[in-house]
Amino acid sequence: MDRRTLLKLAGALAVTGLPSRSATAAGMRVVVAGAGIVGASIAWHLAKGGARVTVIDKAGPASHASRGTFAWINATWAKQPRHYHRLSQDGVSNWNTLAEELDIPVRWGGSIEWFDSADRQARLAQQIREQVEWGEPARMVPGEELAALEPEVEFGEVDTVALSPNDGAVDPVLATNRLLDAARDFGATLAFPCELEDAEFGSNALEAVVTSCGRIEADRLVLATGAAADLPRKFAGIDIPQRTTPGIIAITEPLEPMLNHIVVAPGIHMHQRGDGRIVLGEQEGAPDTHQARLRGRPNEFPLQTVADQHGERMLAIARRFLPAIDGARFENVYIGWRPLPLDGHPVLGASPERPDVYLAIMHSGVSLAPIAGQFAAREIISGETLPRLDVYRPDRDFELIRRY
């Protein structure tokens, strides 16, 4: 931790005398644990709203799930049911505002998607019809239009693809850092590496959190801790059932422009950033034989040669659809851990056991970060509960809809 951050954190640690339960927005002290894109968005919205925010993370900004995400901003057919699709639509819409306000480069242009199976293609067409009913400008694009959409992509025998024109993609590490910088501009303290270790409660009200950096007096604690399933139990007194799965993200060196859309092809996801780098994401999870070595949830491969092998494997799949990518070299190949609440929906809200602890855990964190940050900050600062978030509360029945 650099000297400037240490001095600022020392100031945050020294604050005393503010009442917990009656804290106003101007005086409310909030510790946000987790400096991924969701935690960063919440921190920015809180700081902008007048709260006194400290952001901690045991490693640093975007070092866990947000680093290893494909970073597809979308409200596609997979966002079910209607209430979750609407939330995702608002997330996409808020990205337009956020990108402009914080100068975050988003590559808009939409996504195209198709499957190998005829049955799955038929179901995709049905799902796109539902998307249209839900207000999306999505459509099935016939084969004769595909070359104009993506001249470099080989579609093989497929005769239609789904086009979702509102989708975009972003560099999640850059976006997270822009949000944190903006939060700091509103007075937030950023402390990395700084691990959450304990919380102190008096009369059921939060008094402070204990970290590897010291004791921080706080009125609220936000757990934006992604795939760390043990932390809600320890700090919020509640279990969040989730299946945390690894996925590999490979990022090439800058290449000539060759993709216009996010391409979701059988076995591989691809998109090209504005700087020319192509991001590859795999669709399949790790084989059972890898479970032992993945038990510690590493973000890095044990050897560079192993990372290179995975990159080349993904490149071979990508070459089937994008021959021009042949010969690409990778800058980064790493493992991302996806927090997947069992019903597939975000967890947003105060713990019923410890109301001063607010949970914000979700898959599709990139798509939802702007709207989740806005809603979470509003609930924390005002003390109100937004009816729209009732279906996402941490004490819901996760078995009603089991997706993961």
What residue ranges belong to the model's regions?
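Glycine-rich FAD pyrophosphate-binding loop
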Residues: 48-66
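Active-site lid/adjacent beta-loop-alpha segment flanking the redox-cofactor pocket in flavoenzymes
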Residues: 256-354
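C-terminal catalytic lobe of FAD-dependent flavoproteins
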Residues: 319-404
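N-terminal Rossmann-like FAD-binding beta1-loop-alpha1 element of flavoenzymes
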Residues: 30-54
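Flavin (FAD/FMN) cofactor-binding and adjacent substrate-gating region
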Residues: 93, 104-107, 116-186, 191-192, ...
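N-terminal export signals
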Residues: 2-23
